[in-house]
Amino acid sequence: MLIQEPGWTNALKFLIVQYGQVGVSIFFIISGYFLVDKTFKRRRIFKTWFQMFCYSSGFFITLLIIGAFYKYPTVIQPLMQGSELFRTIAASFFPFFYGSYWFISAYILMLLCAPFINSLRQSLSKRANLSLLVLFSFLSIQILIFGRVSNWNNLTYAIFGYLIGAFIKKNNTEISKRMRTAPMLAGIVFMTLLMLLFNYFASSSSPISSALGWTNQIHNGIALFPIAIGTFVFIIISRINFDRVPELVSGTIVGISSTTFGIYLLHENIFGFRILWEYVSKFCYAPDSLLLRIVSAFFIVIIVFLVLSCIAKIIDILFVHPLTDKILAYFMK
């Protein structure tokens, strides 16, 4: 958790954190784009939930076995003793209800709502669908007006992304004509600068930022902007002719992208991020030069991503997918 302090350096740190929501937004948008015309399938929901359950409970069971022979790492010892152990068990075996993975939980709820959203969209005119997007846009920034009322949560976030993806799918031709790449890139830069400025003023504890309630909103920032940036990025990428991309590159991208759920489940596990970054900090030392710090941080992130991708691939192939197929074959014949 970042400590809120005044200054541009702190504002930049929070900007990096907020930019993580761009990837989340793109995932929700992709879901709406591809599922708007699809029929409801229980299998899709079960597969998502079961993968989350396998990673969450499997991590806990693995640590229990290791703990029988070796001492737990210092960073997770508090989670495995006393009253905290009960919460750890609940988080590991009931991840959906405990909120262990907010993104996956929101995604599952979005899938459950998808058939109703699709029916609603079909009954609405294009103007009404646009009005619905405007309504959700307002909900995302409502908290920034005096900081007292918010109707924005993980589910509304997921549904908003779904609605955007569905709107793009249904109006793809018109969007391609009206939304040019250069203005969208300029919009991304402009919104990024506004996010940075917001973080600076929100952390300054000025009378205006305090009166508007911004001092308590620096972590989430302007929630609408990462969604808008994610929308622009999705539209720009969708225009790329992937037939011209070398087969090796496209195959690698597809292979890595198939493990993104697993990477998230490993890293965001209550044990995962603690153990991972504890050992990364032990083996990696921060250089004195700022430039070298940035370069080394970049390579550390890439290496961690690739390592987690390989681990997730192994877990999925050896355990998750075979178990999922057997359960579905038995119960959903």
PLM regions with names:
Residues 175-262, 268-299:
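Alpha-helical transmembrane segments and terminal signal-anchor/GPI-anchor hydrophobic tails
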Residues 43-51, 102, 129-132, 153, ...:
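Alpha-helical transmembrane segments of integral membrane proteins
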Residues 1-4, 64-65, 199, 268-271:
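Alpha-helical transmembrane segments of multi-pass membrane proteins
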Residues 276-286, 290, 315-333:
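Membrane-proximal cytoplasmic C-terminal regulatory module of class A 7TM GPCRs
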Residues 51-82, 86-87, 91, 110, ...:
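Hydrophobic membrane-embedded alpha-helices
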Residues 11-24, 90-106, 144-161, 196-232, ...:
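Interfacial loop-to-helix transition and helix-capping segments at the boundaries
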Residues 17-25, 31, 35-99, 110, ...:
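Transmembrane alpha-helical segments and their boundary/interface "anchor" motifs
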Residues 23-38, 103-118, 141-177, 221-244, ...:
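Specific transmembrane alpha-helix
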